[in-house]
Amino acid sequence: MWAVQGILAALYERWHTGKGRLVECSLLETAIGFSSWTSAQWLADHKEPTRQGSRHRQNAPYQRMQTKDGYLMVGAAGEAIWARCAKALGHPEWCEDPRFATNQARMANRQALEAVMNAVLTTKTTNDWVEVLEATGVPCGPVYDYAQMFADPQVRHRGLVQYASDAELGEVPHIRTPVRIGEGVRVRNVAPKLGQHNAEIFGRLGVGQAELQELRARGVF
């Protein structure tokens, strides 16, 4: 991802200036680059970051929450969204509670916040809460397992799952690349088996059938 961004930036510059650029992107820098939140925290206070699970490091509640039949992601960052969230959950008084009145207070009392929210969210299903929260403008979404993910109407509509033909296994399902250009290119066949095209390739090199049989007899391939 970082390499692609660098390449696109260099191409854009070449388009405007006519000059090329050397684009570098190491795995080390890429790994550290993905830790921007925790790196910024450590550089500011030199305190070792701790594991947060699905919790956001700067906002609460902004995390996965349990429901009656699964899990839900809630992103109530900011006071306006938090007020709508509390009201949608049937507890507008949470906004007046000193423990939850501000984001700073909610971060400091995260365990208590999670406890009261879980007590409410576990009374209804994930789909019920998605409908309620979306209706009030609270960012949210279901947390899928794999069966739910591949059954999702949008995943099916986008044709993310494709099939390749295998002589032994039949139609083999796989996920295509997420990038689509125009109609896209579909993989119709699986990778060749070891040595499957030996005769064809050796034939292009001028190796005849008799020599091929000799090579096979000698165990060359």
Sequence positions of predicted segments:
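Conserved active-site and cofactor/substrate-binding residues in soluble primary-metabolism enzymes
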Residues: 2-5, 76-80, 112, 124, ...
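Aromatic-enriched alpha-helical interface/lid elements that frame and gate functional surfaces
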Residues: 58-136, 140
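Active-site-adjacent "lid/gating" segments in soluble enzymes
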Residues: 1-72, 76-80
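Short linear loop/turn motifs
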Residues: 96-106, 144-153, 211-221
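Flexible, small-/acidic-enriched active-site or ligand-binding loops
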Residues: 101, 165-214
